Swiss-Prot record:
Alphabetized InterPro entries for the sequence: 6-hairpin_glycosidase_sf, 6hp_glycosidase-like_sf, Glyco_hydro_9, Glyco_hydro_9_Asp/Glu_AS, Glyco_hydro_9_His_AS
Gene designation per UniProt: CEL3
Stored PANTHER family: ENDO-1,4-BETA-GLUCANASE
Cellular localization per UniProt: Secreted, Cell wall
EC number: 3.2.1.4
Protein family according to the UniProt entry: Belongs to the glycosyl hydrolase 9 (cellulase E) family.
Reported tissue expression: Specifically expressed in root cap cells.
SUPFAM superfamilies hit by this protein: Six-hairpin glycosidases (SSF48208)
Protein name: Endoglucanase 9
Length: 484
């Protein structure tokens, strides 16, 4: 008991909120899901709520004589990168699976967002036998322009992987997304669920049979934007873990075992999936009491010990205001992803009355929940500069985000094309963006808790789908009134 009290005392100052009341988590949850409408590519439906967006990318895939319309633009540009898009989809699906009962009416909005992605991913997987399409748009040209997706005139180059040009990382992540989504739709659309799962199995087999990194196959088309820096074995473990959860087929358990133990990371992101796989597999050890997965439970707890402040093995920095700080570029992507894992592992711990040790300190579920809550509250405005890093949440939020469509006149107000360079006049102005991308979470503050709110500062001012996707689960947890 002494070690537990000492551990809690040591980092209690980090967990104490500076605010007098909790943020409105239900509002934040709703807006975090609404954000995805602003990232849509393809023909927009009548129910589109973010009305300053219009249909775009309607010829995507035509360069390869296939239909690759739909999906999401990853961040503030007009390119569809499937590796982060599939990860976004997996995390949205995991959120719905773990926290759907706590989402209330927002669960249907989550399903809509998931399906917008999976409809596109199904096209990518099924359009051409022996190929998996993994992206649309030339990032090197796109990033030289500042134009709306509705009238972009940059090349819509199509990228794919195959047996001769493998991409196990993007293939296994696509399989993970489809498998996870198949469980989301199992009870509400069984036919669609079966299609998702059947396709997930095929794509996962492709990833296993033809191993290699998509960065090697596609080089400058995906690097340095979304290089697979961690390699592809983490995605193989992650993808197989999701197929195992969706099917309970021992084939996937045996394949996971054949991969070995994997790395011991202190991060979780669209690139490095090991920590996510460990937490997902630890579910079987804890909830199903399956001793075959004990090593992954231990790996998950080793990861958490690297995150918790004042843990003997902690390798995570925190700002003075209490925010996890991993890397300078888009730090909040790591904060939201890690926070999801903390909240979810705490959920498993509570269900089984489980505790574990970081050195001599006994870790209880509420230690993880308290740290998660501190990160969520910080993002929503409980921080030294009282800035909400979610656009449109509270009165003080980023006004000049690095996002083409948000920063330029809407297509409804100015239908004439701006051209590749026509938007830079808006880019360089200090005026707030004319279109509010409600719910978008930007890259976040610097290590000193500061945020300059400059449009050209993409490291801090650019939103991304995967930042939001991982935030949905923790928001749903706290929106349901779970503060401990």
């Amino acid at each position: 008991m002494t070690s537990l009290f000492f551990f809690v005392l040591l980092f209690s100052s980090l967990l104490i909120s500076n605010g007098d009341a909790n943020p409105n988590y239900k509002e934040a949850l709703s807006k975090s899901l609404l954000f995805f409408q602003g990232q849509r590519s393809g023909p927009l439906p009548r129910g589109q709520q973010i009305s300053w967006r219009a249909s775009s990318g309607l010829s995507d895939g035509s360069a390869a004589h296939v239909d690759l319309t739909g999906g999401y633009y990853d961040a503030g540009d007009n390119v569809k990168f499937n590796l982060p898009m599939a990860f976004t989809t997996t995390m949205l699906s995991w959120s719905a699976l773990e926290y759907g009962k706590r989402m209330g009416p927002e669960l249907e909005n989550a399903r809509v967002n998931i399906r917008w992605a999976t409809d596109y991913l199904l096209k990518c997987a099924r359009a051409t036998p022996g190929k998996l399409y993994v992206g649309v748009g030339d990032p090197n040209v796109d990033h030289k322009c500042w134009e709306r997706p509705e009238d972009m005139d940059t090349p819509r180059t199509v990228y794919s992987v195959s047996a001769s040009n493998p991409g196990s990382d993007v293939a296994a992540e696509t399989a993970a997304a489809l498998a996870a989504a198949s469980m989301v739709f199992r009870k509400v659309d069984s036919k669609y669920s079966r299609l998702l799962l059947a396709t997930a199995k095929d794509v996962m087999q492709f990833a296993i049979q033809y191993q290699g990194a998509y960065s090697d196959s596609l080089s400058s088309s995906v690097c340095p934007f979304y290089c697979s820096y961690s390699g592809y074995k983490d995605e193989l473990m992650w993808g197989a873990s999701w197929l195992l959860r969706a099917t309970n087929n021992p084939y996937y358990a045996n394949f996971i075992k054949s991969l070995g133990g994997g790395d011991q990371p202190d991060i979780f992101s669209w690139d490095n999936k090991y920590a996510g796989a460990y937490v997902l597999l630890s579910r079987r050890a804890l909830l199903n009491k399956d001793s075959n997965f004990e090593q992954y439970k231990q790996a998950a707890e080793n990861f958490i010990c690297k995150i918790l402040p004042d843990s003997p093995s902690s390798s995570t920095q925190y700002t003075q205001g209490g925010l996890m700080y991993k890397l300078p570029q888009s730090n909040l992507q790591y904060v939201t992803s890690i926070t999801f894992l903390l909240t979810t592992y705490a959920k498993y711990m509570k269900a089984t009355k489980h505790t574990f040790n970081c050195g001599s300190s006994v870790i209880v579920p509420n230690a993880l929940i308290s740290l998660s809550k501190r990160q969520v509250d910080y993002i929503l405005g409980d921080n030294p500069i009282k800035m909400s890093y979610m656009v449109g949440f509270s009165s003080n939020f980023p006004k000049r985000i690095h996002h083409r469509a948000s920063s330029l006149p809407s297509h409804a107000l100015r239908s004439q094309s701006l051209g590749c360079n026509g938007g830079f006049q808006s880019f360089y102005t200090q005026n707030p963006n004319p279109n509010i991308l409600t719910g978008a979470i930007v890259g976040g503050p610097n290590q000193n808790d500061g945020y300059p709110d400059q449009r050209d500062d993409y490291s801090h001012a650019e939103p991304a789908t995967y930042i939001n996707a991982a935030f949905v689960g923790p928001l749903a947890y706290f929106a349901a009134g779970r503060s401990t």
